[in-house]
Swiss-Prot record:
Optimum pH is 7.0 with DV-Chlidea or DV-Pchlidea as substrate, optimum pH is 6.5 with DV-MPE as substrate. Optimum temperature is 25 degrees Celsius with DV-Chlidea as substrate, Optimum temperature is 20 degrees Celsius with DV-Pchlidea or DV-MPE as substrate. This is Divinyl chlorophyllide a 8-vinyl-reductase, chloroplastic. Keywords: Chlorophyll biosynthesis, Chloroplast, NADP, Oxidoreductase, Plastid, Transit peptide. It comes from Cucumis sativus. It comes from the Eukaryota. Its main location: plastid.
């Protein structure tokens, strides 16, 4: 028997024994499933930028799906269904992109089951009620994707089949343990649990930077991507779409308020070390939603950027100063400073292992300061703006203009902040 509660109404409703699946998942109610928390621990080794770390102490289990799914699979039929009869499980639903993906899927008429933590958002500051309001229109299931048994129990209590899983999970910090816990383990759990409930398609939000994996979160994402592809290879009735977006608008907006207040625009080197084709959260959410039904996106790795030309940090700063009507004022930081800092941190990690995440954060900052978020052409070994697909209509200039007038509300960087 499922228990639903209307948000803020203080009224509990018990669905009758003969309730249909669509009744149980009616968008008029929010399905709330409390779960207990468990401790989670990882062992990890120190990371060096110049070599691939070894994880010999940490045994990783391959993706295993029970031979007899809990519910009858809908492998050949979900794309022919009416959207309102298609159940889509979204994990990472309260994140920056996940929230927009839920809204987009709901707007297209899909029956969305959004998995959320009881304390979500940046540093867990959002309550269950706030999460439910944020995910309005979806059926919110409070669970813990980092523990497979907890997630499977939550889905079992819902007692409905799953057609598609959409994963928008991503490590908040990029730290070593957090990367493997979220980008690999939790994402794997969502695949296993979804397939055990009949899911026949998996849409993964990955990142374009995994093309050149020098960071721990990139390796974790690539490991899951490989296992996802292998799962589809072994089961012809199971498919995937791997979405690798370029930079998000919010990751480029951290200096808007500073420049508005008269501070210089900070960039590394000459401001031309890297470039990207940034994409808005709404455009990316639309592309991810397209992957649910579009057959031309089945079993594909899909790099995607926003509209317009690729922009270097120098060009991004010039756009910002033009919108403000100010003379450009740049502060150029030699990239060698970051290399020196990383070298010091790597040395300290040998004596103070607890500093390994600090060293990793330095490498993350260095990576984004020098590596382009564009297609890496295997023939030339160079990044190619021309080969990076564009999608959507929102431009970075539009975003900057909006932030200048409205602020960064809803675009907070949290632990991802650099400036």
């Amino acid at each position: 028997m499922s228990i639903c509660s209307t948000v803020g109404a203080g009224l509990n409703l018990h669905s009758p024994a003969n309730a249909t699946n669509s009744t149980r998942l009616s968008s008029n109610f929010v399905h709330q499933i409390p779960v207990s928390s468990f401790s989670f621990s990882f062992q990890s080794s120190s990371l060096r930028l110049s070599q691939t770390p070894k994880f010999s102490r940490q045994r990783r289990n391959p993706i295993v799906v029970s031979s007899t799914p809990v519910v009858e699979s809908t492998k050949s039929s979900f794309r022919a269904k009416n959207p309102k009869d298609t159940n889509i499980l979204v994990v990472g639903s309260t994140g920056y992109i996940g929230n927009f993906v839920v809204k987009e899927l709901v707007s297209r008429g899909f029956n969305v089951i959004a998995i959320a933590r009881e304390k979500s958002g940046i540093k867990g500051r959002n309550s269950k009620e706030q999460a439910s309001d944020q995910l309005k229109g979806a059926n919110v299931c409070f669970s813990d994707v980092s523990h497979l048994d907890v997630l499977e129990k939550s889905l079992g209590d819902l007692d409905v089949p799953i057609d598609v899983v959409v994963s928008c999970l991503a490590s908040r910090t990029g730290g070593i343990k957090d990367s493997w816990k979220i980008d690999y383990e939790a994402t794997k759990n969502s695949l296993v649990a979804g397939r055990n409930r009949g899911a026949s398609h998996f849409v993964l939000l990955s990142a374009i930077c995994v093309q050149k994996p020098l960071l721990e979160f990139q390796r974790a994402k690539l490991k899951f991507e490989a296992e996802l592809m292998e799962a589809a290879k072994e089961d012809s009735g199971f498919t995937y779409s791997i979405v690798r977006p370029t930079a998000f608008f919010k990751s480029l907006g951290g200096q808007v308020e500073l420049v508005k207040d008269g501070k210089p625009y900070v960039m590394f080197g000459d401001g031309k070390l890297c470039a990207c084709k940034p994409i808005s959260e709404q455009d990316l959410a639309s592309f991810i939603a397209d992957c649910v039904l579009s057959e031309d996106k089945i079993n594909q790795v899909l790099p995607i950027g926003g509209p317009g030309k690729a922009l270097t940090p120098l060009e991004q700063g010039e756009i910002l100063f033009r919108l403000l009507g100010k003379e450009p004022n740049f502060f150029k930081v030699p990239i060698g400073i970051m290399d020196f800092a990383i070298g010091v941190l790597d040395f300290l990690v040998k004596f103070f292992p607890a500093m390994e995440d600090a060293a990793e954060y330095g490498k993350i900052g260095r990576y984004y300061a020098a590596e382009s978020m564009l297609i890496l052409d295997p023939e030339t070994g160079e990044y190619s703006a021309d080969k990076t697909p564009s999608y959507g209509k929102d431009t970075l200039e539009d975003f900057f203009e909006r932030v200048l007038s409205e602020g960064m509300a809803g675009q907070e960087l949290g632990e991802q902040s650099v400036f």
